[in-house]
């Protein structure tokens, strides 16, 4: 059996900068920087090497608003160099960083399990129905405006969920 002989589920097309993903477009290669996002020169250099090696998309971590703004500077530097690779902000536990990144990069990756909630401390939490409804409302009050900002700036959103980054509320 050939690794090139496979079937794909039908999907929609999504734009990440100038890169189209999904539907009948080829599977895209994404890499991730291991530089400090606040080191603009080193991050731009590595992103440029990643693009030259054949990646279609590059992801950087944005722990806070400062890193999210740095990604905008990295993007400007890459465009100045003629490198068009779209950038993805990898966000965990910090909706303010997600809001900042939405205006700076082509895609923001968030985890809805920790978008508003604090990091896990592995506590068993018990909620009344009323408390749980308030928690969900908190998420809706933050997530809705985030999606609206992304729509306004044509910023793609990847919702990534994995067990290790779910909040205590979900667990």
Regions found by a protein language model. Name each.
Residues 1-60, 65-87, 92-171:
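Alpha/beta enzyme core
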